């Protein structure tokens, strides 16, 4: 991979910030079409519009940062897509301003805008931003094995939702629901940056890990008020994400894109369902809902058993929910590793399906 701007660090910083802020600008413009809040509208007016104008003025830097060093020389079709996207978004924002309330914000609204803007921008930060702006951390900094840095990151996973709860607990239901939709969809947008259109042609690369599914299920539950599906997130995703945070499976540098994406995913999967109940957006489920969640988990579990065995024929590294490797077993000791010695295999139409009945049964029961 060739760095678009080489040693010209200032251009890299401009391109990274433009891309990040453009994500936020596009997102707020879209949200403003569905939810009518004064603060959101002011963000579109005084943040999103200026950012999109900057995109046009600095289009060579903006486009090169996204498409690559030879974007203009190669005539990449993405340049046209970026230009169309920018013009449509800017036109949409300006049209709303022209037909809407043209008054200037009050002093109180300005203060609210300034206080809200950082929190509107941060959740949608592309995972590569820390690495692009600050580089790698020292390799001695490990966010795994419960090191000091790892514990700090875990503590943040508890502190952040508490702060969000304290801020929103006395707000109206509609404000709380909108804020949580905004937060969850923004984090999902940032999370899927890790994937590309090529991923669609490789099902074994799809985000089918248990915690990955939360990034798509929770927004659906929020937007379409899917109460039954939400119980799956609350009972299953939360516990799975907590275990994943403690048994962190990150091999990248702590500042690398993959690591940041990992924590965006698991923070959201861990605290968002709990936060939604605490804020009374969803009711606290009872025993009946718990039974439904267990049945849903069983369906997911056995589906992943089959999917792992099937897709391993195309990629030996397939390991959805860690059912296909010794990642969990080695954390528990030799006795757990040896449970994988018992295997059952069969061949169907040239494909080999391998299962670990003892290990996978104990995994399910546990």
Give names to the regions the model predicted:
Residues 9-16, 73-86, 136-156, 290-294, ...:
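Membrane-interface transmembrane-helix boundary segments in multi-pass integral membrane proteins
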Residues 50-62, 117-127, 185-195, 237-249, ...:
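Aromatic-anchored segments of alpha-helical transmembrane domains
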Residues 63-76, 195-205, 224-228, 248-261:
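Membrane-interface helix caps and helix-loop-helix hairpins in membrane proteins
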Residues 150-156, 180, 199-211, 234:
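Structural signature of hydrophobic alpha-helical transmembrane segments
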Residues 251-301:
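A contiguous pocket-lining binding segment that forms or flanks enzyme active sites
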